Amino acid sequence: MLVLVVNCGSSSIKYKLMDMEQESVLLSGLSERIGIAGSRIKQENNKGEELVLEQDLPDHKAALETILKCITDAKYGAIKDTAEIKAVGHRVVHGGEKFNKSVVIDAELMKVLEEMSELAPLHNPPNIIGIKTCQELMPHAAQVAVFDTAFHSAMPKHAYTYAVPYEYYEKYKIRRYGFHGTSHKFVSHRAAEILGKPVEDLKIIVCHLGNGSSISAVGNGVSQDTSMGFTPLPGLPMGTRTGDMDPAIVPFLMEKEQLGVNEIGNVLNKKSGVLGVSGISSDFRDLEDAASKGNERAELALNMFAYGIIKYIGAYTAALGGLDAVVFTGGIGENSKTMRAKVLNGLAYTGLQIDEEKNNTRGKEVIVSKPGAPFVAMVVPTNEELMIARETKELV
């Protein structure tokens, strides 16, 4: 069974064609700068043959039409006809309270999905455009929506409720939703496989660390709490997002800097985080390089990030009533031995010791703690596309 996994952003589309009988990748690609000058598609098939196509892609429909031509290209593609694709799995950022699991999209559910856009106005609209376009271009294929928020829908009410007047929850569904759920689910379940135990029997903290970062407490195989909230803004300080902060700072800054609602939103989401603190970059590789050369603000940004992770691990260990594994994933979690060491050294009070040789790896599954620790520290590369494809296959 062939499944096409699609992730539509505001100006990009990531895609991966998978044969789910072997869970193998036939090809993967990226269409970028959609609707912007210099748009292109870059694709590589499982033979290592790379296609780079530079042409005008005015909108998502044009991009997806071109992507389907690339997928069926005689030399660089992987199939002869799109009719071979049985289902398309779409990443959808926000499912609200109405979608607590993946669903096959029909006309009725599409209306409900469109209503969710007010909860994620930057992310859900392009996700929906992707679904509608694939329905039009591949009417034979089932369209499945896999939600970033779904894995966190099992959180207990006391974990997701905010202490604002309850009527706001009833009227506007203001609550903690959490994000990166597909990654947290894949990684926690894979960690359990590596440890040789049922995920339901383990207490796991997953640290998804990248330009956007979130931490989740996984117990009984589901998310019990997570660091992101109503939006992806709270939690850890991120590439350009503030993370947790006193909300009273918002009206204070709006008054002092004469900022409107959209302007303060832009500051908190696009100009803050480690970029705002360091004044250098939102890329942690740049910060590690600058810190190694003595840049104090870069070092401060890195220390703030590590400190936030350590605090969340401590809090979630208490919330779970114990801990079996801390799992690092995402671009930073998988590749930065420096950040992993900062975090794990902060947990040395538990008796955990780092295996320096094993920690000196990038992008591989590995246990980085020495034997005898009270819990296991490990790296598990995430694979959101595979998780989306699996959930799509289950529903079709």
From Swiss-Prot:
GO BP field: acetate metabolic process; acetyl-CoA biosynthetic process
This protein's GO CC annotations: cytoplasm
InterPro entries (alphabetical): Ac/propionate_kinase, Aliphatic_acid_kin_short-chain, Aliphatic_acid_kinase_CS, ATPase_NBD
Coarse class of the protein's main subcellular location: cytoplasm
Marked site positions, Transition state stabilizer: 180, 241
Claim: ATP-binding is one of the keywords in the record: yes
Subunit structure: Homodimer.
UniProt-annotated location(s): Cytoplasm
Active site: 148
Cofactor note: Mg(2+). Can also accept Mn(2+).
Named cofactor requirement(s): Mg(2+); Mn(2+)
Pathway: Metabolic intermediate biosynthesis; acetyl-CoA biosynthesis; acetyl-CoA from acetate: step 1/2
CDD domains associated with the record: ASKHA_NBD_AcK_PK (cd24010)
EC number, as in UniProt: 2.7.2.1
Name recorded for this polypeptide: Acetate kinase
Binding positions (Mg(2+)): 7, 384
